[in-house]
Design a protein with these regions (language model features):
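Surface-exposed amphipathic alpha-helices with a cationic face
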Residues: 55-62, 117, 139, 143
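Short intrinsically disordered terminal tails
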Residues: 1-2, 163
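His/Asp/Glu-enriched short active-site or ligand-binding loop at hydrolase and phosphoryl-transfer sites
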Residues: 97-110, 134
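Acidic, Mg2+-coordinating phosphoryl-transfer loop and its flanking beta/alpha structural elements
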Residues: 126-163
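Short, aromatic/basic amphipathic alpha-helical patches
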Residues: 84-94, 115-119, 141-146
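Conserved Lys-Pro-Asp/Glu-containing loop-to-beta segment of HAD-superfamily phosphomonoesterases
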Residues: 109-137
Length: 163
């Protein structure tokens, strides 16, 4: 069975550093504004350092015969917001992500990871699951079940691929 290294990356303030931030009561309006392009995504706010580090992991794993699957895992209240994120990523980092996932809340991220990993285990042997997310609650939940999980700043500066 082929080995696979699973990576899950959050979008907001992990993969993309937002210029604008909003309160929870404004969240729906901002979802719509980004979703309909009233606030455009800009490539300069993409976390290029994170992308480069993940590409290095992909290459190192390839040399060892390990497949790497990179997945976006983001929270979205509206489908137009999700589509605008994925369209932006397809444009600026084509073929970087293997799969895009959207969940309705941060609490749904861990169950989504577990469900997708279970599906992947039908064909592959998972050697590691790495979660990169700016949300402490998400990383703590993932660490509690044995996944590697960290904030983007820590990942970019300190993460080393294990042997």
């Amino acid at each position: 069975m082929q080995k696979v290294f699973m990576i899950y990356i959050d979008f907001d303030d992990t993969m993309y550093d937002h210029k604008y931030h909003w309160r929870f009561d404004e969240d729906f309006d901002y979802n719509i504004m980004f979703g309909f392009g009233k606030i455009p995504y800009e490539e300069k706010y993409l976390n290029h350092e994170l992308v480069a580090k993940v590409k290095n992991i992909i290459e190192e794993n390839r040399k060892k015969g390990i497949k790497t699957l990179v997945n976006l895992l983001t929270g979205c209240r509206t489908s137009v917001y999700f589509v605008s994120k994925t369209n932006f990523l397809d444009e600026v980092v084509p073929e970087f992500f293997d799969q895009y996932f959207s969940v309705s809340s941060q609490e749904d991220k861990l169950p989504m990871i577990q469900a997708y990993n279970k599906k992947i285990e039908e064909e592959y042997e998972i050697v590691n699951t790495l979660v990169i997310d700016d949300g402490f609650g998400v990383t703590a939940q993932c660490q509690d079940v044995g996944y590697e999980a960290m904030a983007p700043g820590y990942f970019e500066k300190h993460y080393e691929l294990g042997e």
